[in-house]
Amino acid sequence: MKVIEGVIPAPQAKIAIVVSRFNSFINDRLVEGALDTLKRQGQIADENITLVKVPGAVELPLAAKRLAKSKQFDGIVALGCVIRGGTAHFEYVSGECAKGLAQVALEAEIPVAFGVLTTENIEQAIERAGTKAGNKGVEAALSTLEMINVMNALGA
């Protein structure tokens, strides 16, 4: 039986990180985790990483699509944080963001990792940005690296 499974190191890969500025005190921690992972575990040099900042989570898919269409990147790490408030806005923002990023990955056929926190409150967001529940930026970077290698193994 042939098994195709990705590995983490991808030293030649070119990665874009697109991050929302809204809730930057959380997102900055996600970026730190992703960058550390890409450099240490992915063995990717600084010059092969591009960081793009957008206003909010709704803008992540459009920026990711433009990055993917440029054909300059092997994978995209999308990072952000949407915290539930007192209105239905949370559902619209988180749903459209997730759907848009998935669509970019499918259309461009490159990995687009969903590292957008969707939490009930600020405490949950803090926990997932490097404290009690790990750092989801790290997880998104690892997923991107592994999927780059899986896609390369699968061929054109």
Curated annotation (Swiss-Prot):
The keyword Transferase applies. One of its GO terms (biological process) is riboflavin biosynthetic process. Its EC number is 2.5.1.78. Keywords: Riboflavin biosynthesis, Transferase. GO terms for cellular component: cytosol; riboflavin synthase complex. (2S)-2-hydroxy-3-oxobutyl phosphate binds at residues 86-87, 128. 5-amino-6-(D-ribitylamino)uracil binds at residues 22, 57-59, 81-83, 114. The keyword Transferase applies. Pathway: Cofactor biosynthesis; riboflavin biosynthesis; riboflavin from 2-hydroxy-3-oxobutyl phosphate and 5-amino-6-(D-ribitylamino)uracil: step 1/2. One of its GO terms (molecular function) is 6,7-dimethyl-8-ribityllumazine synthase activity. Belongs to the DMRL synthase family. This is 6,7-dimethyl-8-ribityllumazine synthase. It comes from Tolumonas auensis (strain DSM 9187 / NBRC 110442 / TA 4). The lineage of its organism: Bacteria, Pseudomonadati, Pseudomonadota, Gammaproteobacteria, Aeromonadales.
